[in-house]
């Protein structure tokens, strides 16, 4: 027994620090892994475009992935449309350079946001539910496209938040989406829509 205790005390301090460092790194790696989107979401290959989309675990995971694929296709079509039509406009250059169709996913179950753009388009995430915690009822494609254009408007906007510049870009993209037959704007003042537990009551397309 005395021999074993002696070995412990003569152990090089650098060895102990090395073990502590390794343990610390393992804990950090585990935290990062379990906090990633891929761990909290289920990634499904869409039958629409063959790409993989990460969505919440639900009975309709395939429908959810296909819904994101359809929205991604429409967003790409809109971005390409305005890029060809307005190649010199600064807001369009920001949109074209910022939008990343490879990083479209559903919001995490723990997310406080209904939808968001990370780093001005590096990643777009959407709640796909009509009611916030009801994974059984997906939002309709038309309403989700309105939300997607809202997020694309953030990508096109230099300022942060919902300032005048944002609302001008939002209305502009809605007008272009209408002209390109990508999205037919709906007057939510006349007919509000429920989306992820909130009510959409306004559409800047109809603002004078």
Regions found by a protein language model. Name each.
Residues 1-4, 208:
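Compositionally biased low-complexity segments enriched in polar/charged residues
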Residues 5-33:
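Single-pass alpha-helical membrane anchors
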Residues 23-49, 58-139, 159-208:
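Metalloprotease/metallohydrolase-associated module, dominated by Zn2+-dependent proteases
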Residues 50-55, 145-149:
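Surface-exposed beta-strand-to-loop junctions
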Residues 146-158:
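Active-site recognition of the HExxH zinc-binding catalytic motif
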